[in-house]
Amino acid sequence: MGTSLSPNDPWPLNPLSIQQTTLLLLLSVLATVHVGQRLLRQRRRQLRSAPPGPFAWPLIGNAAAVGQAAHLSFARLARRYGDVFQIRLGSCPIVVLNGERAIHQALVQQGSAFADRPAFASFRVVSGGRSMAFGHYSEHWKVQRRAAHSMMRNFFTRQPRSRQVLEGHVLSEARELVALLVRGSADGAFLDPRPLTVVAVANVMSAVCFGCRYSHDDPEFRELLSHNEEFGRTVGAGSLVDVMPWLQYFPNPVRTVFREFEQLNRNFSNFILDKFLRHCESLRPGAAPRDMMDAFILSAEKKAAGDSHGGGARLDLENVPATITDIFGASQDTLSTALQWLLLLFTRYPDVQTRVQAELDQVVGRDRLPCMGDQPNLPYVLAFLYEAMRFSSFVPVTIPHATTANTSVLGYHIPKDTVVFVNQWSVNHDPLKWPNPENFDPARFLDKDGLINKDLTSRVMIFSVGKRRCIGEELSKMQLFLFISILAHQCDFRANPNEPAKMNFSYGLTIKPKSFKVNVTLRESMELLDSAVQNLQAKETCQ
């Protein structure tokens, strides 16, 4: 009897095969259950070790509870849930770090794990995604940041000639600022100093980056600078467009703000790109750099040509405009905000202003202007600067971070790709580190001998720490010291007695004082400032 082995005929079943199959199925089920139990236990452990936090409402999460003054909301929540807690903004889970211990453990001890930026829509817009400040953490990012930091350090803090150039830029703008403040205060009038400080600081950074300055009346320059507050609100912690991206898909105020944000970034990028192209065209081969843009272009061209002389990392040429955008944009905004705080505090604490002026008169005298060389001998001026930074915490929460790997802080599990907010304000207002933190007291930074306490100054957190620490920190502190020293040496500042004692502020990436009025009078005359600027111009003409 013949047999057929057609592909359509079933194979005969062997009883042993049935037993083996049953055993394999049973083992598979047991293995699946075992793995599932392990994963469930691991998930439960992670949930048990996840940071605590408040109940989050559907759709909006904790957005309503955070409000505008996010740093204060975070500090209040930290008192209930601890220094590491979790909130939800929209559908985005966010871990918030408060206090020096938690922040140091995350950003310094585990710097690489917390060095990324979230994939936020607003971050992708800045400099077309090439921004160092808002860009993702990668090997390429590390090389570019190291190059930019090295260039800034060498260009302004290590070379005496470059430091003198910076002092000259600040002197010129301080002279113009004094003249405008005094003119606006004629006949006992009071004026809002904020617009003038914005242009003054931006002009210093324009001279540093591009080798040029603008008139305070220049409409295009003033328009460019007028969007600082809008930019800060959009990229700051808790921006709705980033945590509720679905708001971009139908008409609403958030979408309108985001489209305006896109336009202002295009305008700003075009402004920087125009400067970059003009510098590339006018830069002579072998010439010394005229400004920071030149220095970055020359470094990038050497890298492109394969010149490794001098070693160290170098910027890619295509990244120069974005890097200059970061330096110019961030510096002029944060420094003008800081200078506004310094003037506000002078008027609200006249005894502090008097003591600053007395120290300047004693150390510098009345026959010349303060300079960087005077800084070691002006401890109270430095104490005033650091107390102003601590008290105002004008950058209350850093640009949002993101984790690059599964990690933990103070025993709490934080998964990879988690958005992290860092509350710098909580460090600067910690009552365990700063007695009576809500009191403004520069003397807290002086030791028993009246010298600056460097251990305390290092605890002030305003420029972040770790891998994302601001590369312009030294340059910023130099400018603030020079500005406030020259202004205090030359002028008296008086508050408007009709203004309420309680101040109002706008919140975003920085805390900005809202409108306040001052009266500014010369302590002597403009002669010393005029003479110093004329001498500076004469030296520049001879060079």
Swiss-Prot record:
Regulation: Enzyme activity is increased by liposomes containing anionic phospholipids, phosphatidic acid and cardiolipin. Inhibited by naringenin with an IC(50) of 5 uM. Enzyme activity is increased by cytochrome b5.
A Gene Ontology BP annotation from the UniProt entry: collagen fibril organization
E.C. number(s) listed in UniProt: 1.14.14.1, 4.2.1.152
GO MF term set: estrogen 16-alpha-hydroxylase activity; estrogen 2-hydroxylase activity; heme binding; hydroperoxy icosatetraenoate dehydratase activity; iron ion binding; monooxygenase activity; oxidoreductase activity, acting on paired donors, with incorporation or reduction of molecular oxygen, NAD(P)H as one donor, and incorporation of one atom of oxygen; oxidoreductase activity, acting on paired donors, with incorporation or reduction of molecular oxygen, reduced flavin or flavoprotein as one donor, and incorporation of one atom of oxygen
Effect of residue 365 to W: In GLC3A; allele CYP1B1*18
InterPro entries the UniProt entry points to: Cyt_P450, Cyt_P450_CS, Cyt_P450_E_grp-I, Cyt_P450_sf
Record's catalysed reaction(s): an organic molecule + reduced [NADPH--hemoprotein reductase] + O2 = an alcohol + oxidized [NADPH--hemoprotein reductase] + H2O + H(+); 17beta-estradiol + reduced [NADPH--hemoprotein reductase] + O2 = 2-hydroxy-17beta-estradiol + oxidized [NADPH--hemoprotein reductase] + H2O + H(+); 17beta-estradiol + reduced [NADPH--hemoprotein reductase] + O2 = 4-hydroxy-17beta-estradiol + oxidized [NADPH--hemoprotein reductase] + H2O + H(+); estrone + reduced [NADPH--hemoprotein reductase] + O2 = 2-hydroxyestrone + oxidized [NADPH--hemoprotein reductase] + H2O + H(+)
Organism superkingdom: Eukaryota
Annotated phenotype, changing residue 423 to Y: In GLC3A; juvenile-onset
Tissue: Expressed in heart, brain, lung, skeletal muscle, kidney, spleen, thymus, prostate, testis, ovary, small intestine, colon, and peripheral blood leukocytes. Expressed in retinal endothelial cells and umbilical vein endothelial cells (at protein level).
Membrane topology: Peripheral membrane protein
Localization of this protein: Endoplasmic reticulum membrane; Microsome membrane; Mitochondrion
Effect of residue 390 to H: In GLC3A; allele CYP1B1*21
Location (main, coarse): endoplasmic reticulum
Cofactor names: heme
Cellular component terms (Gene Ontology): endoplasmic reticulum membrane; intracellular membrane-bounded organelle; mitochondrion
Pfam families: p450
Induction: By polycyclic aromatic hydrocarbons (PAH) and 2,3,7,8-tetrachlorodibenzo-p-dioxin (TCDD).
Keyword annotations: Disease variant, Endoplasmic reticulum, Fatty acid metabolism, Glaucoma, Heme, Iron, Lipid metabolism, Lyase, Membrane, Metal-binding, Microsome, Mitochondrion, Monooxygenase, Oxidoreductase, Peters anomaly, Steroid metabolism
Associated pathway: Steroid hormone biosynthesis; Cofactor metabolism; retinol metabolism; Lipid metabolism; arachidonate metabolism
PROSITE patterns, A to Z: CYTOCHROME_P450
Chain positions recorded as heme binding sites: 470
Assigned protein family: Belongs to the cytochrome P450 family.
Disease in which the protein is involved: Anterior segment dysgenesis 6: A form of anterior segment dysgenesis, a group of defects affecting anterior structures of the eye including cornea, iris, lens, trabecular meshwork, and Schlemm canal. Anterior segment dysgeneses result from abnormal migration or differentiation of the neural crest derived mesenchymal cells that give rise to components of the anterior chamber during eye development. Glaucoma 3, primary congenital, A: An autosomal recessive form of primary congenital glaucoma (PCG). PCG is characterized by marked increase of intraocular pressure at birth or early childhood, large ocular globes (buphthalmos) and corneal edema. It results from developmental defects of the trabecular meshwork and anterior chamber angle of the eye that prevent adequate drainage of aqueous humor.
General function of this protein: A cytochrome P450 monooxygenase involved in the metabolism of various endogenous substrates, including fatty acids, steroid hormones and vitamins. Mechanistically, uses molecular oxygen inserting one oxygen atom into a substrate, and reducing the second into a water molecule, with two electrons provided by NADPH via cytochrome P450 reductase (NADPH--hemoprotein reductase). Exhibits catalytic activity for the formation of hydroxyestrogens from estrone (E1) and 17beta-estradiol (E2), namely 2- and 4-hydroxy E1 and E2.
Protein name: Cytochrome P450 1B1
Lineage of origin: Eukaryota, Metazoa, Chordata, Craniata, Vertebrata
